[in-house]
């Protein structure tokens, strides 16, 4: 009858367990490295108006192998949360000098220059009626458009009133009524503005300085113009 070497058996079990632990740790590290590489690529190509959120990052990280432990996971989340904020701030800063569309029923007109603005339709419209009025409520411009699809549409006002006179530099009000057949549909007026500067913070949505238009948060930007 053969004999069993207990010490050898124990040593073999220890070696096997250590090998499995190394493999598991290696797999966990590989998963993390792959995840982090994909995350960095996603951050570089993300939409600055809809950046990846810390909560999304945490959810994705929680699904990878946890062999490295919760403490290490939390540390990783903290590090990459900071990287996300830094990357977002860099991308948002690139908006400086660009024109954007934001929700506003007021447009800022400069005399002698065409004024761009827009509307956002929730659904298709068969008829859109637009009126621009001055601060006294006097109608100075009327425009009628047929058959517009849902989405954002850029429009232009030549800056003249109904008598073809150039209007002075100031703010004007825009009223829009959109209908699909006889049913009125929701519509949002959009004002164009130039991004002058950005105020960033790790705890709040970046603040966009639009000069005479005022300030808005990044999430309010509906369209970035070239």
UniProtKB/Swiss-Prot annotation:
Keywords: Bacterial flagellum biogenesis
Record flagged with keyword GTP-binding: no
Swiss-Prot/TrEMBL GO biological process terms: bacterial-type flagellum organization
Gene3D superfamilies reported for this sequence: 2.30.30.910, 2.60.40.4070
Similarity-based family: Belongs to the FlgD family.
Primary role: Required for flagellar hook formation. May act as a scaffolding protein.
Protein name: Basal-body rod modification protein FlgD
Source organism of this protein record: Buchnera aphidicola subsp. Schizaphis graminum (strain Sg)
Taxonomy of the source species: Bacteria, Pseudomonadati, Pseudomonadota, Gammaproteobacteria, Enterobacterales
Protein encoded by which gene: flgD
């Amino acid at each position: 009858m053969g004999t069993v070497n207990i010490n050898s058996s124990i040593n073999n079990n220890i070696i096997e367990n250590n090998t499995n632990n190394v493999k598991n740790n290696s797999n966990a590290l590989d998963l993390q490295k792959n995840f982090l590489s994909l995350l960095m690529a996603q951050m570089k190509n993300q939409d600055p108006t809809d950046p990846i959120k810390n909560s999304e990052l945490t959810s994705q990280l929680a699904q990878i192998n946890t062999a490295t432990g919760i403490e290490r996971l939390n540390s990783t989340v903290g590090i990459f949360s900071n990287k996300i904020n830094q990357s977002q701030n860099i991308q948002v800063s690139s908006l400086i000098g660009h024109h954007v569309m934001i929700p506003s029923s007021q447009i800022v007109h400069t005399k002698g220059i065409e004024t761009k603005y827009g509307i956002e339709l929730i659904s298709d419209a068969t008829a859109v009626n637009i009126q621009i009025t001055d601060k006294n409520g006097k109608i100075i411009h009327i425009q009628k458009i047929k058959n517009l699809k849902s989405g954002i549409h850029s429009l232009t006002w030549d800056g003249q009133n109904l008598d073809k006179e150039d209007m002075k530099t100031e703010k004007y009000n825009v009223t829009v009524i959109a209908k699909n057949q006889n049913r009125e549909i929701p519509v949002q007026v959009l004002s164009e503005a130039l991004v002058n500067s950005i105020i960033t913070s790790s705890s709040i949505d970046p603040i966009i300085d639009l000069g005479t238009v005022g300030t808005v948060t990044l999430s309010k930007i509906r369209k970035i113009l070239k």
